[in-house]
A protein has these predicted regions:
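Tandem amphipathic alpha-helical repeat scaffolds
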Residues: 2-11, 36-51, 70-88, 110-127, ...
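Helix-turn-helix repeat elements of alpha-solenoid scaffolds
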Residues: 7-25, 44-60, 83-97, 121-136, ...
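Solenoid-like repeat scaffolds
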Residues: 25-33, 60-71, 97-109, 135-147, ...
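Small side chains
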Residues: 59, 79, 288-291
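Linker/hinge segments immediately adjacent to helix-turn-helix/homeobox DNA-binding domains
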Residues: 132, 147-187, 191-282, 298
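Helix-turn-helix DNA-binding segment
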Residues: 265-316, 320-336
């Protein structure tokens, strides 16, 4: 690695630099020689396993680190862990710590990292990014491949939120095809984004294939946090692919979904002016998401392995909870 980038192993997804084999994340973390990078990687591993309290505790000492890689990583870990812990003020402070504008004297690599982390902090909350993709493109080559892959996820997620599902999928699949190394965490993000786009394009087989690839990465190390966080956007894939075959994992994932989404909405809703529903079960929310995308009750039933009557009853319950009467009204309460 070039001298100017020596600090970059301490980026978000630090363990990816060591290209660990799924099932060996602990060995990869233990093998990181720099103690600060190893601590951040430990916090990441804890976070991706759904251990928000320990992740935040481990990363917190680096919130004011002078090394921008350590600081940005700690802010993102603590910020998102705080959502699951319902510490909304802490989440806001940590995520705001990423948004400090870099000075002109900072290197292109640091500037690129700042744009990426600031964009991730916003886009993952479904809020406008403070930077455009065009501002990032000239600097992207200064990042190592693992972070460039994560950047592809962030940009693909932004395209998804704009309803550009084909472009979103193309960006993800191009990143996966063109990568040189193996970066499990970034690849997990990318496969989840591809699943989201495929579901919105109603290419269910492709969505399940990408979700299966994500699960193959996540399951050996118990990296279930991201799957739980993406629940609504995955539009029933978790239920269709995991509920019967992996009931214990499914239960833990749904627990993460409830915990994370509650905190997520407490920032997203007031900051966006939207009113994403907060009193639906995960099953109700999934069915409502699919209904908003134009799925019939019969299609929803086949996808989720239930009867059309069950779907009808669940959606009636959703309308009653939200005080609405039509699918057109439902859209205002769903994720984009």
């Amino acid at each position: 690695m070039e001298d100017g980038l020596r600090w970059l192993p301490a980026h978000s997804h630090a363990v990816d630099v060591h290209r660990f084999v799924p099932g060996q994340i602990d060995a990869a973390v233990a093998g990181i020689s720099d103690p600060d990078s190893r601590t951040i990687a430990t916090a990441e591993a804890l976070y991706f396993r759904g251990q928000a309290t320990l992740a935040a505790k481990t990363a917190r000492p680096y919130l004011d680190a002078t090394d921008p890689a350590l600081r940005y990583s700690a802010c993102l870990i603590c910020g998102y862990a705080s959502l699951s812990l319902n510490r909304i003020a802490d989440a806001r402070r940590c995520l705001a710590g990423i948004l400090d504008t870099p000075t002109d004297e900072e290197s292109p690599a640091v500037h690129a990292m700042h744009i990426l982390f600031a964009s991730a902090a916003s886009v993952l909350l479904h809020l406008p990014s403070p930077y455009s993709a065009e501002e990032f493109y000239p600097l992207a080559a200064h990042l190592p491949e693992g972070l460039r892959l994560f950047a592809s996820y962030v940009m693909a997620h932004a395209l998804y939120l704009r309803g550009e599902y084909g472009r979103s999928l193309g960006m993800v699949e191009n990143a996966l095809i063109m990568k040189q190394g193996s970066y499990p965490i970034s690849e997990l993000f990318l496969h989840l984004a591809a699943s989201m786009a495929c579901m919105s394009l109603k290419d269910i087989d492709a969505a399940k294939a990408h979700f299966g690839a994500a699960w193959d990465i996540a399951r050996p190390d118990g990296l279930i946090e991201l799957i739980g966080e993406h629940h609504g956007l995955l539009q029933g894939l978790i239920e269709a692919c995991l509920k019967s075959q992996y009931p214990d994992d499914f239960a833990r994932i749904i627990e993460i979904t409830y915990r994370f989404s509650y905190g997520w909405r407490r920032i997203h809703n007031p900051d966006s002016g939207e009113d994403v529903a907060d009193d639906l079960t995960t099953t109700e929310f999934t069915m409502a998401m699919l209904a908003c995308r134009g799925w019939t009750n019969a299609e929803i039933a086949r996808h989720m392995g239930v009867s059309p009557g069950t779907v009808k009853n669940r959606l009636s319950g959703v309308y009653a909870k939200l005080g609405i009467g039509t699918r057109a009204e439902l859209i205002a309460h769903m994720l984009r």
